Amino acid sequence: MKKRLLTLVLMLLSLAGCAGQGNEDIPKTGAYTFEDDLGRTISVDKPERVAALTGSFADIWCLAGGEETLVAAAGDSWTSFDLSLSEHVVNLGAIKTPDMELLLAAAPDLVLVSSNTAAQLALLEPLEQAGLTVACFNVTNFSEYLRMLEICTGLTGDGEAY
C-alpha cells in the first residue's frame, strides 16, 4: 500500500512539475524507438500485448495509458500495488520466479523487465530467443521513474498521461 501511495504522490508531483511539457507530439502509429537502461536501442510498433515482470512496472504501464494492453503481470501487481487489473491479465507469480510458460502463453509483443533483478535479467536471452521484444528498466529514483513513464507514454501514444 505504501508503494502505491508513493507512486501516486510521485505521479502528482510529476504532473505539477511537468505542466505544459507533455509528449503531445508522440506518434499514434508506427515504430517508437528508445534506449533501455541496458543501453540497448529498442524499436517497437505500438504494443498491443504487454507483460510487466514487476508490479511497479505494471503500475507505470497502466498510468501511461496501457491498461487495456496489459496481458500479464507479476503477482505483486495485485498484492503490493492493489491494481484493479482485468480478469484477463495473467498472474505470472513472484518477481524473482515469473512463470515462463504462462508468460510465453500470454504472447506479449513487449516485456517490461527490471534490470535490478538478476533473475529477470537471466530471462532476457530466452525471451528474446522466443521472439519477444524485451525492454529493461532500472527505476530507483524519481527521475528514472519519469524517464520510464515518458517512454511508456511514447509506446502507448498517450502523451497526455505524461
Where are these regions (language model features)?
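Extracytoplasmic
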Residues: T29, D37, D45-E48, G65, ...
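Extracytoplasmic substrate-binding proteins
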Residues: G30-A31, T41, A122-Y162
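Short amphipathic alpha-helical segments
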Residues: L6, C62-G65, L124-E125
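Residues that mark the start of a beta-strand
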Residues: P47-A51, T69, T133
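Hydrophobic core
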Residues: L10-G17
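Bacterial Sec-exported substrate-binding components of ABC uptake systems
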Residues: R4-L5, G17-D59, G159-Y162
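A short, structured surface patch at a secondary-structure boundary
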Residues: A52-A106, L110-T117
